[in-house]
Structure formats: structure tokens, C-alpha cells
């Protein structure tokens, strides 16, 4: 299977500009004619750090009917591949417990919003609309938890696919036991052979350090992702088919307008300071008790990464390796 991830430096509140950037990347680096899947990050065209429902309202998109979906349908048909893209969904589900708006007035009806991804077939058919189940602090300022739990189902010629969005791979609300591995175990139980993660994953590295070597991946971040999929690595010891996980993250920085944030490493990002994204989009194949990195992008570069899931890996780590240690390329 040939897979591509489009790593973007999404600009807050500049949907048309971000779409134009994505189009320019695809024009300058045309995907192969036999591409099966193109994956974009979480909230790919809107930016991520919205501090309130009011701030994101102008950029909400009707369920599978807004600019992100329209773009995905167009690109899917143009390149003859599946497309997955993250977007802020305005549903027709009524929120029974709305919060007062900033002016102190609660509207008569408020519809639930979700942090979602839409999956489109090569013919432009909507195959899935997944709503993020585990919300990060930033999401909680405007989105509801997904109402159907994690997703694992057949998606056309892609086969059995598990879909996730960023925080989904973490312990629920950072409070569940570390080794519960809710998302990974759901994918495993569902028999997924492909796991697709759209992400807006933060880094604890300062902005200046992120800009020094933008072409180098944030290996500590990738190491953490692998840890969160330990059940797949362990299960692969007993044989069976390979499982491939695709991580499509974003790059760049945004102003933290939401609240004091804490990264997975425990670093606190104060309100009003910049938050940076870790990039490092990659694909990992789990087989024989090993996690094989097929290819990866840098922590600060925009572009298109194309790979074949049967490719020889850049390097791999085994189940018995200390995954908490920083990964190093050979």
C-alpha cells in the first residue's frame, strides 16, 4: 500500500491560505499515480488553539460538507486515492447543557461541535466521519467528546482501519492508568491492519530549538508514540499480519490563547506564550515484536512524505528495548 502524509504549518484562521499551501505542496511534489491514501493533520486548514466556542465559530464546518471535505473530495478524485483530513465539525446534535456565551446570554439552541476527521474514497464518496474521543485541554474549550467511541471498521480497499486523532492515544484525561492503552487495545481487538492518526502534537522543545534543524525529526516524540502502541508490538510477537500506523502531524507554532497547558513531558506552557508542534510525521510497521520506522519527516518542515508500507525500514526497535530512551538513527 502506498501512503502519503502532508505535513503543514497551518496558520490560525487562514483556511484559504492553508488550502492553497496544501495545493502548492501537491503540485510541487505530485503523488504517484498508484497512491492509496493521503493523510492530513488534525484541524488541518483552520489551525488548532482556539480558546472558546466563539473564537472557532466562524471556522466550523457542517458535518462532511465544509471546505475541508470539499477539498478532500476534489483531491481524492484528482489523484485517485483515499483522503483523510481533520476539521472542526458543527453537527446537528443538540447540546443539552450549553455554557453561557461571553456576553452572558445562552442561545435557545446550541449544536454540538466535534474535533473530527473525514475519510473520502477515490471516487469522492464519504466513507467515515470520526469524532475525537479523548479531548486535550484545548479541545475542551469548544468541542464535545466523540459520541461513538473509537473507530475501527472496513474502509473500502484500505481494509480494516482504525482512525484516531492525537490525544486519543494518551490515557483518558491523563488520569487513566498508563498501561491501559485504550486506543491501541481497541485497534488490536478490532483487527485493524492500518491505523491512521491525524495529529496536532505539541513538543516541549523551545521554538528556537525547533527552528535550528527543521529537517531532523523529534525522536523523543516518535519514541513516545511507539510506547503508546506497545500492545501492537507485543501482539506481533505471535505472528499474524503486519500492522502499519501512520502519524500525520503538523509543524509550526501558535499563540497559546486557551489556558496554561502541560505537555506529556510535564512542561508547562503559560497562557500567552507560543506553542510549537512536533512534526515528525512517519509510518511504522509492527511485526515480529519490532516497530520498524518506514520513513519520517523533520520536526519543522512542510511537505509530502510518500512511502510504501512494504518498504525496507530506516531502523527499528524491539519490544525488549528501552523505548523511553531517545531513539537514534543508525
Please provide the spans of the model-predicted regions.
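Extreme N-terminal starter segment of soluble prokaryotic enzymes
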Residues: 1-5
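N-terminal phosphate-binding loop and adjacent alpha-helix
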Residues: 6-25
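Residue-level signal for short segments within beta-strands and strand-turn junctions
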Residues: 7, 121, 285-287
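Residue-level recognition of beta-strand->loop/alpha-helix junctions
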Residues: 7-9, 41, 49, 131, ...
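Cys-nucleophile CN-hydrolase/nitrilase-fold catalytic domain and related Cys-dependent amidase chemistry
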Residues: 15, 24-122, 129, 138, ...
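Short amphipathic alpha-helices and their capping/turn segments at secondary-structure boundaries
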Residues: 19-35, 150-152, 182-190
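CN hydrolase (nitrilase-like) catalytic-core segments centered on the catalytic cysteine
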Residues: 66-84, 170-302
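Active-site catalytic loop in hydrolytic enzyme cores
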Residues: 74, 91-194, 198-199, 204-222, ...
